[in-house]
Amino acid sequence: MRIFYSVDVHGAETVWRKWISAIAMYECDCLMLCGDLAGKALVPLIDFGKGYYKSGYYGREVKLKTEEEMLDWEQKLANGGVYSCRINKKELEDLQKHPEKVDEIMKQEVVKRMNKWLDLLCEKIDTSKILSIVMPGNDDPIELDTAIKGHADRGIVYPTDKVVDLGGHELISLEYVTPTPWDTPRETSEEGIKKMLEEKVSWLKNVPNSIWNIHCPPRDTDIDLAPQLSKELKVQAGAEGVKMVHVGSQGVRDMIEKYQPLMGLHGHIHESSGFTFIGKTLCVNPGSEYGEGQLRGFVIELNPTEIVRYWKVQG
């Protein structure tokens, strides 16, 4: 079996389309997109009643006079992982008074895009022949899970609640991470991580031959390094450049050391693309450059008893 494994797309439509295209490019039997599927920003297109809409993102302000211009702007935002909505001045004032309504619109757009993406995946890929695994991550609202599970009858696999057969290997999956500065929807303590993993390990029949799809990477490795942040959540830099610190999970590491599965598939830390070994266990993190439209991934070849080869790709 040949797997294409990628993570942390964060709503970027360009990256999603590239992920689907990878099946032909790398002649894979399995597609895995695991962790942090949703974007992080919502940009309004505002009708002030003057014959045009105004919008802006990252310091750029635009006036949109035609439907074609609005669709083009919305697509540019989507390609970069940003959601959009069309509102008038009165609706803008209401949203400013009621921030919780912005959250609701955001969740609606997240689910809408996820459904669109999964529909596209099912159109482009024969899911009866290509194993297609899609897993949320810590940044993703719970509502997103419904969209993935809603495509089960079309062959999309939601993996966190079951053991998945991966070319003769048992796959278990965990989307939770240890606490972050941003208080994301799926966080738990180190003990919580270990408890969740212990339960999933109990489902396995052959632990040494299993593969663990855990969004959070193991601590103190080459795949858990992120920029050090100040109390104001600003990146810390010195004379030698950005300071990097280990931010992975000790609980994940402890469990890998204890059980020594065949392989760990990880993500979460965008800057730490690479691989490492914990004992006999190979652990990989493709990293992410979704904002630049870059697809990062690992191609992994398996036979029923071992990893044949693996390599990192980007494009």
Regions inferred by a protein language model and the residue ranges of each:
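Binuclear metal-dependent hydrolase catalytic cores centered on His/Asp/Glu-rich metal-binding motifs
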Residues: H169-S210, V245-H246, Q250
